[in-house]
Swiss-Prot record:
Self-association state and partner proteins as the record states: Monomer and homodimer. Part of the essential Sec protein translocation apparatus which comprises SecA, SecYEG and auxiliary proteins SecDF-YajC and YidC.
Cofactor note: May bind 1 zinc ion per subunit.
Keywords noted in UniProt: ATP-binding, Cell inner membrane, Cell membrane, Cytoplasm, Membrane, Metal-binding, Nucleotide-binding, Protein transport, Translocase, Translocation, Transport, Zinc
Record-given protein name: Protein translocase subunit SecA
Binding residues for ATP: Q89, G107, E108, G109, K110, T111, D517
NCBIfam families for this protein: PRK09200.1 (NF006630), PRK12904.1 (NF009538), secA (TIGR00963)
HAMAP family reported for this sequence: SecA (MF_01382)
InterPro entries recorded: Helicase_ATP-bd, Helicase_C-like, P-loop_NTPase, SEC_C_motif, SecA, SecA_CS, SecA_DEAD, SecA_motor_DEAD
GO MF, one example: metal ion binding
Matches recorded under SUPFAM superfamilies: Helical scaffold and wing domains of SecA, P-loop containing nucleoside triphosphate hydrolases, Pre-protein crosslinking domain of SecA
Organism, as annotated: Ruthia magnifica subsp. Calyptogena magnifica
Recorded topology in the membrane: Peripheral membrane protein
EC number(s) reported in the record: 7.4.2.8
Length: 892
């Protein structure tokens, strides 16, 4: 900040100060209503909810009733919980209601603050999600604050892991739902794998209040939620079919076009021009026989039955792998991997993979490990999930240091809400030692002194390993203590709640116990007797006399925010307290950024073993090092988001397609439209008005129609009638329509429509899953292009768009193939169509690396100004699938 800005800030206040000053005017209005609310009976107070809903239905806005609604919540909380919202809590509620981040210190009552915007926004009937970091906090807060909402006639749900499907659906329908961030994200992905609308649990993502917003939207931004499915069966199928292929023989043919003569009958023909292989009738029979022998196909079942659609695709991929793709020409085998060779440059393309099962088929052929690229069924980052909400807000004790990132990526402004009482915390200068052992011994000495005078101590560590090392040292010194980590949420909350007792010593990893206040004197039970309350008051006063809670940091973290979170555990709500960090030159941060200068300084000072440096200048140097690391981490997260935003845009298109399919009972019109489009393109590959008639590949068209669509049309006979190619194309389309109509007559209209929908959804899911795998490989390999002066991000966007449009075309083609070629008779049960069901599905929160981002790429990321997310696609905007059509005419 410049000197002029500092002077102006002192005179007129900072932007934050001015904003808070404006909100205080609204606080005064809420307070003016307090006596009026106090005069209401319980029934009159409860009736306010319906009154507000009626006013909203009569076109009043939520903002217009904010003052009254906040006054109602304040009075209800006072009556039900004996907790009255302080003025600063009302300000925090308004900050959240405006879709911003409220930074409020530990102990300022953020849980109570959330009731204000939650109640107001739930009046719209669209639902509010209050997001916490674990199941324990979600359940605790729902039970605790739920009493307020229940009094006012608002339904409250809790969404945690391992819930029954019906219970989860009910929870999402509640006015206000407390949920964990993980479960919300996984439910979103699971909903978009459902086959019926009734299977979905979430409704519109309306208003979210994210507690510990820095932890969820910053710390976990690089850890996507992933749903993966079983793949072992697919690997076995590829192996089984691979062993079958040598049994097939090529059909020998002579001549071209109309003059083809079969010299030696065989099991398949080859179309090298289009890089396709077609099974003959003999080949179909042999394939079925071999599959039955291998117990991959039940006896008496046709390969073209509804349940075997994917099996036929595997056979086709295996034939192409053996017949059309050659080792050391199309690909090489290197380090147990099949690596594609670019047909134009002759260079290998590490990380790239063929789709539609071809790459796995080649891996099976070459005897290398069959990669599980289809393992990921669905994936999303928290960054892109939470940006789906109409309004997003958050609260934490430490957000200001990440304000730029919140603004750039989420469009959220961070406002620091003043404390209810001025802080009395004493932040002591860091102590820096030469070695870790000296540091730990100094910590043990400090802890022992505090325990001796009855001052409670919280020792914060960066890892479970360090927690155990310090615990061992304290045990050797006979210092009684508790150790907790982030594994058992319920136990940690109990220990943290009592960490403020006289002489208590608690060792905790930095994140353990967040969300639970440390009360000086220990937590007082709600059922406490008068005597217990008196005893607690005595202990509370004794702890204050001893100096309040003392925080010991065992090392500086890479982020100042994490250090501030630890400091914030002390001196809640105006209590006394103190903090000190102990460092050594062997700590990671010091070793990387400050060790040489600091070690030189220590040597010049002639420091003895066990001595420490303690100076504000040292603190500033460490904070500068932290700023460097924070900047690097921010650049990496921003860079990764540019990649993920591409997948996010594509994900929205696919999920919208799924929703469109599930929302209608009759998809026939959509199928007919797809069929016409596919056949027109398919037809043009063989016969075109731009070609001379003798160059038409009528035989190839006939064979392809027979193989892919089970349609044996007399194309030559039709052409001999003198029809033009437009009429020929029309007859093919009509012929395929007749085939489908015949199948419908066999099974009935309703079952056929359900079958069509199932096949369309299944095909969409199958190729989307393959596309996700291909995108993942592309993202891992594209960074190498930075070395040849190409922007990897732009390369990724360009290629992924081409892959996406190709996938959409493939989906349409496969839908038409499947529905045209499937065998249906009187005994067929069309509900048996193989679906990509969710049996064996696993959810995981997977840690990802920075994708090998190098310095050059980070520089590119800095130069290319990062754009905030776009608004939702309007119905008249161009569709993001690249069709060139308006969204409403394409995927809208």
């Amino acid at each position: 900040m410049s000197i002029l800005n500092k002077v102006l800030s002192k005179i007129i206040g900072s932007r934050n100060d001015r904003f808070i000053k404006v909100l205080y005017k609204t606080v005064d209005k809420i307070t003016e209503l307090e006596s009026k609310m106090q005069a209401l009976s319980d029934e009159q107070l409860k009736s306010k909810t319906q009154e507000f809903k009626d006013r909203i239905n009569n076109k009043e806005t939520l903002d217009s009733i904010l003052v009254e609604a906040f006054a109602v919540i304040r009075e209800t909380s006072t009556r039900v919980l004996d907790l009255r919202h302080h003025d600063v809590q009302l300000i925090g509620g308004m900050v959240l209601n405006d879709g911003n981040i409220a930074e409020m210190g530990t102990g300022e009552g953020k849980t109570l603050v959330a009731t204000l915007p939650a109640y107001l926004n739930a009046l719209s009937g669209k639902g509010v999600h209050i997001v916490t970091v674990n199941d324990y906090l979600a359940t605790r807060d729902a039970q605790w604050m739920g009493k307020v909402f229940d009094f006012l006639g608002m339904s409250v749900g809790v969404i945690v892991s391992n819930m029954a499907h019906e219970d989860k659906q009910s929870a999402y329908l509640c006015d206000i739902a407390y949920a964990t961030n993980n479960e919300l994200g996984f439910d979103y992905l699971r909903d978009n794998m459902a086959f019926t609308s009734e299977q979905k649990v979430q409704r519109i993502l309306n208003f979210a209040i994210v507690d510990e917003v820095d932890s969820i939207l910053i710390d976990e931004a690089r850890t996507p939620l992933i749903i993966s499915g079983p793949v072992d069966d697919y690997a076995q199928i590829y192996q089984t079919i691979n062993h079958m292929i040598p049994n097939f023989t090529k059909q020998i043919e002579n001549g071209e076009g109309k003059e083809i003569v079969i010299e030696v009958a065989g099991d398949y023909t080859v179309d090298e021009k289009h890089k396709q292989v077609f099974l003959t009738d003999d080949g179909h029979g042999k394939a079925e026989h071999l599959l039955i022998d291998a117990e991959a196909l039940p006896e008496g079942v046709s390969l073209y039955d509804a349940s075997n659609i994917l099996l036929m695709q595997h056979i086709n991929s295996a034939l192409r792998a053996h017949i059309l793709f050659q080792k050391d020409v199309d690909y090489i085998v290197q380090d147990d991997e099949v690596v594609i060779v670019d047909e134009f440059t002759g260079r290998t393309m590490p990380g790239r993979r063929w789709s539609e099962g071809l790459h796995q088929a080649i891996e099976a052929k070459e005897g290398v490990s069959i990669k599980k690229e289809n393992q990921t069924l669905a994936s999303i980052t928290f960054q892109n999930y939470f940006r789906l909400y109409t309004t997003l807000s958050g609260m934490t004790g430490t957000a200001d240091t990440e304000a730029v990132e919140f603004q750039d990526i989420y469009g959220l402004e961070t406002l620091v809400v003043p404390p209810n009482k001025p802080s009395a915390r004493a932040d002591k200068s860091d102590k820096i030692y030469l070695t870790t052992q000296e540091k730990f011994e100094a910590i043990a000495f400090d802890v022992a002194n505090c325990q001796q005078i009855g001052q409670p101590v919280l020792v914060g560590t960066s890892s479970i390993e360090n927690s155990e090392l310090i615990s061992t040292l304290l045990e050797k010194n006979n210092i009684k203590h508790e150790v907790l980590n982030a594994k058992q949420h319920e136990r940690e909350a109990i220990i943290i709640a009592n960490a403020g007792s006289i002489g208590a010593v608690t060792i905790a990893t930095n994140m353990a116990g967040r969300g639970t206040d440390i009360v000086l004197g220990g937590k007082l039970s709600e059922e406490a007797t008068d005597k217990q309350k008196v005893d607690w008051k005595i202990q509370h006063d004794d702890v204050i006399k001893a100096g309040g809670l003392h925080i010991v940091g065992t090392e500086r973290n890479e982020s100042r925010r994490v250090d501030n979170q630890l400091r914030g555990r002390a001196a809640r709500q105006g209590d006394v307290g103190s903090t000190r960090f102990y460092l050594s030159l062997e700590d990671n941060l010091m070793r990387i950024f400050a060790s040489k200068k600091m070690a030189s300084m220590m040597q010049k000072l002639g420091m003895e073993k066990g001595e420490a440096i303690e100076h504000k200048m040292v603190n500033r140097a460490i904070e500068n090092a932290q700023r460097k690391v924070e900047g690097m981490n921010y650049d990496a997260r921003k860079h990764l988001l540019e990649y993920d935003d591409v997948a996010s845009d594509q994900r929205k298109v696919i999920y919208q397609l799924r929703d469109d399919l599930m929302s209608v009972s009759d998809v026939q019109d959509r199928f007919i439209s797809i069929r016409v489009k596919v056949i027109e393109q398919f037809f043009a590959d063989y016969i075109s008005a731009e070609l001379m008639e003798e160059d038409w590949d009528v035989e190839g068209l006939h064979n392809a129609l027979k193989l892919d669509y089970s349609a044996d049309f007399p194309l030559k006979q039709w052409l001999d009638e003198g029809i033009d190619i437009d009429e020929l194309q029309l007859r093919i389309i009509q012929g395929l329509s007749t085939i489908c109509d015949h199948k419908e007559k066999i099974v009935g209209t309703k079952p056929m429509r359900e079958f069509e929908k199932s096949v369309m959804l299944q095909t969409l899911d199958h190729y989307w899953k393959e596309h996700l795998a291909a995108m993942d490989y592309l993202r891992k390999s594209v960074n190498l292009r930075g070395y040849v002066q190409k922007n990897p991000t732009q390369e990724y966007k360009h290629e992924s768009f081409a892959m996406f449009t190709s996938m959409l075309d493939t989906i349409n083609i496969e839908i038409v193939k499947s529905l045209s070629s499937v065998t249906i008779n009187e005994n067929t049960n069309v509900s048996d169509v193989e679906q990509e069901n969710n049996e064996g599905v696993q959810v995981q929160h997977e840690e990802v690396e920075t994708l090998g981002v190098n310095d050059a790429e980070l520089e590119i990321a800095k130069q290319n100004k990062f754009q905030k997310r776009k608004k939702k696609v309007g119905r008249n905007d161009p569709c993001s699938c690249g069709s060139g059509k308006k969204y409403k005419k394409c995927h809208g």
